[in-house]
């Protein structure tokens, strides 16, 4: 094989296409995480090719390259699969996707270690990372400052935070920090020589810092200002002084840049730091801790977190034990808490052991190099303690695995062992990309069909019937299909079909607590004439989704039931507000009035609410009223 087309060179080329094009793929979707987001499916297509190249290298060289860190990670991954065998893992199938993603990450690290990537190859990879970050940073700034109403990507121009392709501002913030990390690595290895390279590095630092600030993520801000002191001691000893100064100056200018558009727009600021989320995170952690204490040894079962959380939260809220009520919680926004609640002590101790060993291994180097390596991983590690970046973004997970592989190799070196099996690695090198790409491309078709189905009134069932591979969105696919059958059965009075829906929803309600699940179940009971069961379900939904919270089942039920029900709700709502003012009740009333087209009344209620509750910022910034309160032509 010519030097131009070595496996290492092909690895760089595939990675380059991913960072320049693949990761930025856009397709309309209905939100979510993991494989529900189209760009993640495309990233996994490229990732499978990268894994395949690593396995092909094993076949060609007939050698295995590894170190102790890789063995520890492999052993830890096996341990994390074991709770699937627990007797309480009723919903374990819904944890398989994250276990497969974790295992794929180990395969990525393994594949990178097999390839004999030279310093030049690694520098190219870092520059490709800079390119990807630069593209996303500029795209995020375009979203925030240049896009107009009705843009084809569907970005809400009233939003105060940019999200890039990720549809989640905090994930954008963590991703763009990779630009600062990659540039720091480049200048530490004196790989920034030409003027063009300096322009790329400094330009990326400037725009990445700007995008990080406008992402409005407190986690990202903490990570940004914590990683600098971690990186600086090693950079001071290894980087050329003028490059280090330029690096720091560009980051500082990027952090200051968001103030410039505000100064040019007569001081009209766009507040990037959005609503109060600290109380929500504290609540999730507090509820998770209580759940862990109740089942510390075997946990509540993989895949069960969503169902058990909301009932526990409602019970604690009724007792006045928590502040900050949260909804649609499928993850506690803390990775350790997630595994501990679902799997108990084994996953918890495994993760702590893995983290402890890795920190121990890198601190066998000089303290400046160890702090530098820790700083390279710090933004992602911090983010996993406050949210779920690896679930929202496959590219963040991939880059994290890249960094782990390189750091582990620098800290411990690599051992080489003969591996005479030549055929098996070559077969898997072909099969893994083949099946992954087929799965992900049919997944993109699934996303398109389900998005079209839901956006066009959920009435054209042929869209669901035309889906080839429902697995990437299996829960949503099943819900849409069963809801369509429920609606048809209600109209045609098909009692057997209605009972079939209730039987199916029994398991769903224990696994996933959502307002739409309660609503459908109530409709099924009513259609069967089971008014007592319908009322019991309604009361349970009110318990899970109280009236004075952001998500109120009473309001949602009225909104879905029809105009008369909504008008009756507004009468009830006003009566409640006479006795005690409440921000959430006011917001529900205003949103209901907007839905009914009573805009002037909604504006009066907002003014009244702001006077009665002057410290409630949410009352001054209600999204449904923005089109009627902002000046013409503003964005």
Give short role names for the model-derived ranges.
Residues 1-82, 92-94, 107-123, 127, ...:
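Transmembrane signal-anchor hairpin modules in multi-pass inner-membrane enzymes, especially those
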Residues 9-23, 42-55, 77, 81-86, ...:
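Alpha-helical transmembrane segments of multi-pass inner-membrane proteins
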Residues 16-20, 204, 330-334, 362-386:
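Loop-to-helix entry and N-terminal half of a specific, functionally important transmembrane alpha helix
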Residues 31-34, 88-100, 158-172, 285, ...:
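Short aromatic-rich membrane-water interface segments that cap or initiate transmembrane helices
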Residues 32-36, 92-97, 166-169, 215-219, ...:
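Membrane-interface catalytic loops of GT-C/OST-like multi-pass glycosylation enzymes that act
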Residues 45-48, 228, 369-423:
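Transmembrane alpha-helices of multi-pass inner-membrane enzymes
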Residues 148-161, 275-279, 290-294, 302-342:
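Interfacial juxtamembrane loops and adjacent helix segments
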Residues 227-228, 250-293, 327, 447-460:
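Flexible juxtamembrane loops connecting transmembrane helices in multi-pass membrane enzymes
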């Amino acid at each position: 094989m010519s030097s131009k087309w070595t496996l290492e060179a092909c690895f760089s080329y595939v990675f380059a296409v991913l960072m320049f094009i693949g990761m930025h793929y856009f397709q309309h979707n209905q939100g979510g995480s993991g494989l529900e987001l189209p760009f993640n499916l495309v990233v996994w297509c490229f990732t499978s090719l990268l894994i395949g190249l690593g396995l092909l290298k094993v076949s060609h060289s007939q050698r295995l390259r590894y170190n102790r860190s890789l063995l520890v990670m492999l052993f830890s991954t096996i341990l994390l699969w074991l709770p699937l065998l627990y007797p309480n893992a009723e919903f374990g199938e819904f944890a398989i996707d994250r276990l497969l993603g974790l295992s794929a990450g180990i395969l990525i690290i393994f594949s990178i270690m097999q390839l004999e990537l030279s310093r030049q190859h690694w520098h190219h990879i870092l520059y490709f990372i800079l390119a990807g970050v630069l593209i996303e940073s500029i795209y995020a700034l375009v979203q925030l400052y240049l896009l107009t109403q009705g843009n084809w990507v569907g970005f809400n121009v009233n939003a105060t935070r940019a999200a890039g392709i990720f549809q989640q501002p905090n994930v954008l913030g963590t991703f763009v920090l990779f630009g600062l990390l990659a540039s720091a690595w480049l200048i530490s290895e004196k790989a920034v020589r030409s003027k063009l390279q300096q322009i790329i590095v400094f330009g990326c630092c400037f725009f990445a810092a700007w995008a990080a600030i406008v992402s409005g993520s407190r986690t990202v801000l903490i990570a940004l200002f914590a990683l600098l002191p971690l990186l600086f001691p090693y950079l001071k000893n290894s980087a050329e002084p003028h490059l280090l100064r330029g690096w720091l100056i560009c980051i500082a200018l990027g952090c200051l840049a968001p103030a410039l558009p505000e100064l040019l727009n007569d001081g009209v600021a766009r507040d990037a730091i959005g609503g109060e989320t600290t109380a929500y995170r504290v609540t999730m952690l507090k509820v998770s801790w209580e759940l862990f204490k109740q089942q510390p040894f075997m946990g509540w079962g993989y895949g069960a977190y969503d169902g058990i959380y909301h009932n526990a939260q409602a019970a604690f809220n009724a007792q006045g034990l928590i502040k900050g009520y949260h909804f649609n919680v499928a993850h506690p926004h803390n990775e350790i808490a997630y595994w501990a609640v679902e799997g108990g002590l084994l996953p918890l101790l495994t993760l702590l052991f893995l983290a402890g060993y890795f920190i121990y291994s890198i601190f066998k180097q000089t303290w400046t190099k160890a702090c530098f390596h820790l700083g390279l991983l710090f933004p992602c590690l911090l983010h996993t303690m406050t949210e779920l970046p690896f679930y929202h973004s496959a590219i963040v997970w991939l880059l994290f695995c890249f960094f782990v592989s390189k750091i582990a190799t620098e800290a411990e070196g690599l051992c080489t062992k003969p591996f005479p099996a030549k055929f098996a690695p070559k077969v898997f090198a072909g099969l893994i990309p083949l099946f992954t790409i087929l799965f992900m491309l049919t997944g993109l078709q699934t996303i398109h069909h389900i998005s079209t189905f839901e956006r066009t009134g959920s009435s054209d069932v042929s869209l669901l019937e035309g889906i080839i591979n429902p697995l990437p969105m299996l829960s949503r696919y099943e819900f849409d299909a069963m809801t369509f059958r429920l609606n048809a059965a209600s109209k045609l009075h098909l009692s057997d079909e209605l009972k079939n829906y209730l039987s199916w929803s029994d398991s769903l309600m224990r696994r996933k607590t959502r307002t739409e699940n309660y609503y459908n179940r109530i409709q099924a009971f009513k259609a069967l004439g089971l008014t007592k069961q319908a009322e019991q379900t309604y009361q349970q939904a009110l318990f899970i989704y109280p009236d004075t919270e952001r998500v109120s089942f009473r309001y949602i039920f009225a909104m879905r039931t029809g105009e008369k029900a909504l008008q009756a709700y507004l009468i009830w709502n006003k009566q409640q507000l006479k006795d005690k003012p409440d921000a959430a009740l006011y917001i529900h009333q205003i949103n209901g009035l907007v839905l009914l087209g009573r805009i002037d009344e909604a504006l009066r209620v907002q003014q009244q609410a702001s006077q009665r509750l002057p410290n409630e910022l949410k009352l001054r910034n209600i999204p449904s009223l923005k089109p009627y309160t902002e000046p013409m032509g503003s964005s």
